[in-house]
Amino acid sequence: MKHFEANFDGLVGPTHNYAGLSFGNVASLSNAALVSNPKAAAKQGLQKAKALADMGIVQGMLAPQERPDLYTLRRIGFSGSDANVLKQAAKEAPILLNACCSASSMWTANAATVSPSADTRDGKLHFTPANLVDKLHRSIEPLTTGRILTATFSDPHYFHHHSHLPEHNSFGDEGAANHTRLCKEYGHAGVELFVYGQEATNPNAPKPQKYPARQTLEASMAVARLHQLEDDNCVFIQQNPDVIDQGVFHNDVIAVGNQNVLFYHEQAFLNTQQKIDEIKRKLDTELYFIEVPTAKVTIQDAVKSYLFNTQIITLASGEMAIIAPTDCQENPAVFAYLNELLTLNTPIKQVLYFDVKQSMQNGGGPACLRLRVAMNEKEITAVNQHTLLNDALFNRLNTWIEKHYRDRLTTQDLADPQLIIESRTALDELSQIMKLGSVYQFQK
């Protein structure tokens, strides 16, 4: 049976804006209050996804969440008509309104952690939505994320969906952005790397001092248990607290893996050699550990360009390609390193550059925009076929974006009651296009 790694990219929602909500995310904070272009953002993401589909990669799309989130605003005491709720919130708590209007669900690397059936005891694909408790604007996502994932991967014979972890900092979980999987072939049992920022229950363990560690060891271990993984399928690695304090808020900002390749910065982890030795013991195949030295690429350049927030994909030829943001081309040190990388003895033979600037300015590169799901042929057949990107769906989504999205949005515009109507109209139509059923609260 054939096996593939599919990418499920998040459609950028109609309220994409720059509110600078993510403390610890340098790009998000430095671009706060810029005027955004939701239409361009959605099209950039869709075009990147379509380019991968055209390369033969199995490519799906995940629907955005309903924003503004009036349900959360009502839970915290704003009342009256929808328009009045927005007006009140804008006047009394503009930062809370901004949080309830964020389009951050576009970064589906944070949607969930996924373990393929080749790794799990029950032979099913497992999904656990991330609770994202560290950031208010993201902590309101998990329930809807779970509904969208269940509507996309709906057959219980193949797919096992878990609830998100308890909503407490001890179980802070940021999903696949802190998880990667190494294997010989996608259909073979692999080793899942769970990267965490701190041990919540051990006050003496290393942790960052300036910015929060969003992922705990306790959360990573809980997900591994839920997914029925054996010890031989797991390696738990602590991210270097010093790089978290330099703006590396998720591991996918400093490392990325694919099949038998782990591409990472030399400062990415604690106890790096010990963990590499553990991976080698647990995965009996030829492995390529590509360590990028600080002398060639500084942490600052890695964060600014998102060198590691790239996708590594395996092409039909068996060679690998890096999907990088154009920001990597524009950074001399990073561009020079990527050109050098292509001359080294590794499976990576191409670098392809994509413009995802609207996402980058909010702190999310190509890897943030996708959730990886390794599947076999039967599992792909069991996926909701209306979520898989082909020419017909691409054209429908492009037309949908053109019809419903604004090309200019400021944080002041978030209080416009018309935005509620526009968003709900768009999402209602999208749920019909993608045959999702009633995944949004306004549809219930």
UniProtKB/Swiss-Prot annotation:
Keywords: Arginine metabolism, Hydrolase. GO terms for biological process: arginine catabolic process to glutamate; arginine catabolic process to succinate. Its EC number is 3.5.3.23. It comes from the Bacteria. Belongs to the succinylarginine dihydrolase family. NCBIfam families: arg_catab_astB, PRK13281.1. Homodimer. This is N-succinylarginine dihydrolase. It comes from Shewanella sp. (strain W3-18-1). The lineage of its organism: Bacteria, Pseudomonadati, Pseudomonadota, Gammaproteobacteria, Alteromonadales.
